[in-house]
Amino acid sequence: MACSIVQFCYFQDLQAARDFLFPHLREEILSGALRRDPSKSTDWEDDGWGAWEENEPQEPEEEGNTCKTQKTSWLQDCVLSLSPTNDLMVIAREQKAVFLVPKWKYSDKGKEEMQFAVGWSGSLNVEEGECVTSALCIPLASQKRSSTGRPDWTCIVVGFTSGYVRFYTENGVLLLAQLLNEDPVLQLKCRTYEIPRHPGVTEQNEELSILYPAAIVTIDGFSLFQSLRACRNQVAKAAASGNENIQPPPLAYKKWGLQDIDTIIDHASVGIMTLSPFDQMKTASNIGGFNAAIKNSPPAMSQYITVGSNPFTGFFYALEGSTQPLLSHVALAVASKLTSALFNAASGWLGWKSKHEEEAVQKQKPKVEPATPLAVRFGLPDSRRHGESICLSPCNTLAAVTDDFGRVILLDVARGIAIRMWKGYRDAQIGWIQTVEDLHERVPEKADFSPFGNSQGPSRVAQFLVIYAPRRGILEVWSTQQGPRVGAFNVGKHCRLLYPGYKIMGLNNVTSQSWQPQTYQICLVDPVSGSVKTVNVPFHLALSDKKSERAKDMHLVKKLAALLKTKSPNLDLVETEIKELILDIKYPATKKQALESILASERLPFSCLRNITQTLMDTLKSQELESVDEGLLQFCANKLKLLQLYESVSQLNSLDFHLDTPFSDNDLALLLRLDEKELLKLQALLEKYKQENTRTNVRFSDDKDGVLPVKTFLEYLEYEKDVLNIKKISEEEYVALGSFFFWKCLHGESSTEDMCHTLESAGLSPQLLLSLLLSVWLSKEKDILDKPQSICCLHTMLSLLSKMKVAIDETWDSQSVSPWWQQMRTACIQSENNGAALLSAHVGHSVAAQISNNMTEKKFSQTVLGADSEALTDSWEALSLDTEYWKLLLKQLEDCLILQTLLHSKGNTQTSKVSSLQAEPLPRLSVKKLLEGGKGGIADSVAKWIFKQDFSPEVLKLANEERDAENPDEPKEGVNRSFLEVSEMEMDLGAIPDLLHLAYEQFPCSLELDVLHAHCCWEYVVQWNKDPEEARFFVRSIEHLKQIFNAHVQNGIALMMWNTFLVKRFSAATYLMDKVGKSPKDRLCRRDVGMSDTAMTSFLGSCLDLLQILMEADVSRDEIQVPVLDTEDAWLSVEGPISIVELALEQKHIHYPLVEHHSILCSILYAVMRFSLKTVKPLSLFDSKGKNAFFKDLTSIQLLPSGEMDPNFISVRQQFLLKVVSAAVQAQHSATKVKDPTEEATPTPFGKDQDWPALAVDLAHHLQVSEDVVRRHYVGELYNYGVDHLGEEAILQVHDKEVLASQLLVLTGQRLAHALLHTQTKEGMELLARLPPTLCTWLKAMDPQDLQNTEVPIATTAKLVNKVIELLPEKHGQYGLALHLIEAVEAISLPSL
């Protein structure tokens, strides 16, 4: 409760504002760094060496100090203003200004804090050479009913050396400009509405006062408020339409010419004042002598005080009504940020006609009205003293003045005299803080002397003067008028003290009472630390003197705090001193504060705390009842009860108590009302859960369950009307409190009955105790599962709690739901520790059944014999609504447990690469999460697990086959055989197939195979979208999509994938490849598509698969019925988002030709990327109709190309397809010249490659290119690469074999030409000489360089020649040439035989 300085805001980047306002400082720093030593950045070994030498020159050091001073003291040279609502700060220098706005951001430490960030920066000058001299940030009140009294927006008022006063918005938009005097503006000050504290105080009007060297102008606040609102509305309308032509209302102002004073530096407008009759007669006598006439009523006057020289302080009084207010011509303008259209609109507002006339109007200054003379009435004459600033107190009774002698002088405004002076404050900055008394802090004893009984009267107000001395770097707070210094802080020498002295403009006596914004009267801006601080001064410091009891109390509190921090071995002595100190404190509020600090001490043992509280309680009870504060007495009593409860619980926990009763499985089955089979099933489930759910928890040796310090215990609990409640604490703290009460009881180490009786007697409700008990049980799952005996303890504890009063309502019957059991079920539903939740639900169900049976037994006791009633209790369970809810909960918890066990299981897979997305841990499940997850929540959670484990779809299929198998022996072999098809990485799956099988049995509807594959498909594509570089995710997603059997689901999922994730990237890839005309490089792919070139190749291949799946599903969906999505009986109440499968079934039918059209484009793009083709523009293969149809909704009907295509398009398409075939054959057969006939297509990094020749033929069919041309080219390429055996197979598909034979004849000639002409052996030359001339000439014309494989055996070529003769008709022109070739080939073959 002492004076304090509080940091409430930071600057996000104050250096940026400094560099903008002082560009030379930034240049000096940069040039200085380069000037010192250019080699420092590279030669670190010489950096700083020799700095200790004595003969080092001192000049650079002084220069550095000067630069450092300029760097830190720059704020002193700026014009600074802060809005009183802290929503805007202005820093200006010369022509430039920076507007700073607060934003909530997280600091480096993760704490949310308010930071001032640059909202606007720029130049404010309009005329050449004018500079900013003063600035104000005035918040304007909102006129909306919903926000009455709150600030709507903040206006920035800026005065210039040219005499102009301009008004801006927060975004730097110029609203209004006024030239009321041609001299420079010296100071701007504002006064806003304040509710008068007393009925006799004159109500002050709002105004803006502008000080000039020889005049003062006051603008009426109401007029200014309306004008600014109108100007702001016009700017907003002009920005929207540009057609507004509304003239804002003129400003009403008064202008006084101050006379009989040499210089004026600052001023204060006190407002309207009315003299008392005595003061009226005294003033009249001083002015007019003893014969002066006196009016009947004292006139109202506006008082102004100026500081300067001759006189040092001048007092001016302007009679109200002596002059009429002047009306200004508003010069409306807009900021340079708005467009030229807005300037044209603005010209319409002011009646400007043309650009030439507009410039003329701007250059012509408005008419300046003459000032009304106003002579100084009196002053404080001091010819040598020059005033520097004046600051008026909040209640307008005092004013503080600084001068050039380093003095701060306190003035009595009403009397016009100096009443106090402080010395030694050169360049001081001053402000005021007004504090209102809190009536609750008054001493109750003093109320007895009041003649009005307990009436304490209105709150008092205290004023404190704040002085900042920058020369000494100290901030002081003084109590006025003659009070002592109540606070002093070291704050640095480069700060600025801001005291606005006003609040929100536009309020009145009604709206000012509605909502009070948070305002700081004083703000200290520290540019070094980049922070904004304020000062808090409690009211009681105004009463501080040598006789003040509160000051004495504060001294005792400080002494007590110091005593609590000391480490003393003699605790008895410390306890005695603390008792004396707390009993000496007089004020109840301070005494309560002292007791709170004692109870919060960690160094005092429990006995000390109890004795001190008991002593204070006894002292208060011994006093008279009227003089004792009831709040303090109740506080002590409550704390004493808590201490007694803590002692009782600690004693019960420390007793040596053990339950030695043996506990068997039969006992557990009877306790939980389960038969042997059900118990074995429960134990098996929990054992699997324990194995898969073991989590390593870090524990320290000092951590002990069930131990709670007394300090923490007191912080958690509170009494309210004799009822013990728990404060709002975190979950961990809640568990710690519950462990303190129940942990030893759950382990059988403390008496359960005694603990329940103690807690009930202390005032804890059964509902609260049940909540604590369950929080402990559910959070300590690992310990509970390791110790089954704790189940018996929980059963006992729950039975005792249920028997307490108000636990179970006496009016409860079997047809209604008991809130008691509903509370327990809700805790189990919300728990993520499913093992502990399932056990507690079994215990709760057993206790509830026992109580229900007892109630039923009482009802039917008259008709049932005693022997039968025992049988009734043991073997029969009374039917009730609660029983049904328990059974439902047990089924849900069992399902959730099995699912949680599955999700925490891990296969021993050794994947080569694990993505960071797969490394993210899965969230734990609870029944509540599954109920709120929608119908697809269960499948979605399993899909996330499958993604994390990266299992292939075959694993899901195998587990499902195991479920469908009829013979339990055969599936094992079938599963083992099928596992050979799964990759080696997934061989060792451990218990995962069994767990999956169990989950399938538990969720036959939610985990139906199509539903699971759909969710897995969606999960993989979602994760791929997060990191498109992981192309294997997209490939795996397509694999799951292919596994979906139902065509309706498959169609919907594929269509959703395309629309949500693929079409944008697909279109980007298309336009990029069409732009570059080839396979784009990695950098371009990353920039435009967001993935690498390798990933984009796989992406296009997967897109092609997806489009083909879409077409296949569309064909087969008419033959398959729409699936019915069922839900398990236990999960019928599930709510939440619609499932992926339901969304898929809602999708429209696709337009098959449009999908086929996209598939053709995708094939082209994939081929270009797969084989790095060049000089290919994909879109150039389509006409305008084809291009326009791309990337449209696949369910819409588009105008597609039809009829005969332009031959030019067909020619280009044919060239492209032949190029694809050539590239495909080259990619397949260039590495090894001879291939195994049984070898399949070469695999790509992301799966098997396409059958490109077949795909090219299919594309030829859709692109109106002759398919036979493509097939013939494929055959020719195969023979070209020497793969004759594959070529013979491909010949069978060619229709025009005659043309093919001619092409193959040329290829045969190339092979023979290479063998005879290019090898140039002796035998070859002799053979060439024996050949017919026609054949020899033809062979010489062949170019063997076109051959891709020249090492084909001659026997293979002989087969090719025979094949050509077989294909050529005898009448063909080249048939004879082919016969000659046979002879040549046979002749070449002879030497090798």
From Swiss-Prot:
Disulfide bonds, paired cysteine numbers: none
Keyword Cytoplasm: yes
GO molecular function terms noted in the UniProt entry: enzyme activator activity; enzyme regulator activity; GTPase activator activity; small GTPase binding
Highest taxon in the source lineage: Eukaryota
Phosphothreonine: residues bearing it: T901
Keywords for the protein's UniProt record, in alphabetical order: Cataract, Cytoplasm, Disease variant, Endoplasmic reticulum, GTPase activation, Intellectual disability, Phosphoprotein
Record's subcellular location: Cytoplasm; Endoplasmic reticulum
Variant or mutagenesis effect after changing G1052C: In MARTS1; may cause exon skipping
Predominant location category: cytoplasm
Bias kind Acidic residues: ranges: 44-64
Keyword Cell inner membrane included in the entry's annotation: no
Transmembrane segments: none
Region (Disordered): 36-67
InterPro entries tied to this protein: Rab3GAP2, RAB3GAP2_C, RAB3GAP_N
Annotated family: Belongs to the Rab3-GAP regulatory subunit family.
Quaternary data: The Rab3 GTPase-activating complex is a heterodimer composed of RAB3GAP1 and RAB3GAP2. The Rab3 GTPase-activating complex interacts with DMXL2. Interacts with LMAN1.
Role noted for this protein: Regulatory subunit of the Rab3 GTPase-activating (Rab3GAP) complex composed of RAB3GAP1 and RAB3GAP2, which has GTPase-activating protein (GAP) activity towards various Rab3 subfamily members (RAB3A, RAB3B, RAB3C and RAB3D), RAB5A and RAB43, and guanine nucleotide exchange factor (GEF) activity towards RAB18. As part of the Rab3GAP complex, acts as a GAP for Rab3 proteins by converting active RAB3-GTP to the inactive form RAB3-GDP. Rab3 proteins are involved in regulated exocytosis of neurotransmitters and hormones.
Disease entry from the Swiss-Prot or TrEMBL record: Martsolf syndrome 1: An autosomal recessive disease characterized by congenital cataracts, intellectual disability, and hypogonadism.
Protein's name in the database: Rab3 GTPase-activating protein non-catalytic subunit
Organism the protein comes from: Homo sapiens
